[in-house]
Amino acid sequence: MKILVASRNPKKLAELSRVLESSGVSGVELVSLTDVPEYEEVPETGASFEDNALIKAREGVKHTGLACVADDSGLAVDALNWMPGVLSARWSGRHGDDAANTALLLAQLSDIPDERRGAAFVSACALVTPEGEEVVVEGRWKGSIARIPAGQNGFGYDPIFVPRGGLRTAAELTPEEKDAVSHRGRALAALLPMLRNLVNLGRTAP
């Protein structure tokens, strides 16, 4: 069966694909927003990651008739009162400019001592079906903000996020290492029972 992943980011699609494969869930064809007829995406106006994930998943079902998985995630920094939060992707003003977002965040934390650079990645994943079923789960990944970027893997703020108890940034981890501990990996793992049930029931889009 086909399941829509409400994203144009191939790394998010690959992440869900790895989680499904490692968990033995088969018979799923994941499609992204680039694989379906284009539709106008609703602005992410929710006050929380959960709100935004549901907004995206509901729109995906509405426009394609496919069961839809959507996530909204971001970085919550202790010293910034848990911002950027839902503004993480456009913290510098332009949506998806990872380099600018990272540079601005590092500048804002330049005078913050190491012991006060705590942060957490947060991911909310929503699954909405054509039958109207909805579920939202959350995953968190605690750590701290490095002073300089390091690593070539991942995306977003990965090069400056050091997981708690680790010495490498998230961008220095292999995809498999990251899947096992990351916020999105944890959220997707929590979503697996619902995805497995959906596949077993063999629900198909109109």
From Swiss-Prot:
GO molecular function ontology, one term from the record: dITP diphosphatase activity
Co-factor binding details: Binds 1 Mg(2+) ion per subunit.
Intrachain S-S bonds: none
EC annotation from Swiss-Prot or TrEMBL: 3.6.1.66
EC class (word): hydrolase
Record note on quaternary structure: Homodimer.
The name this protein goes by in its record: dITP/XTP pyrophosphatase
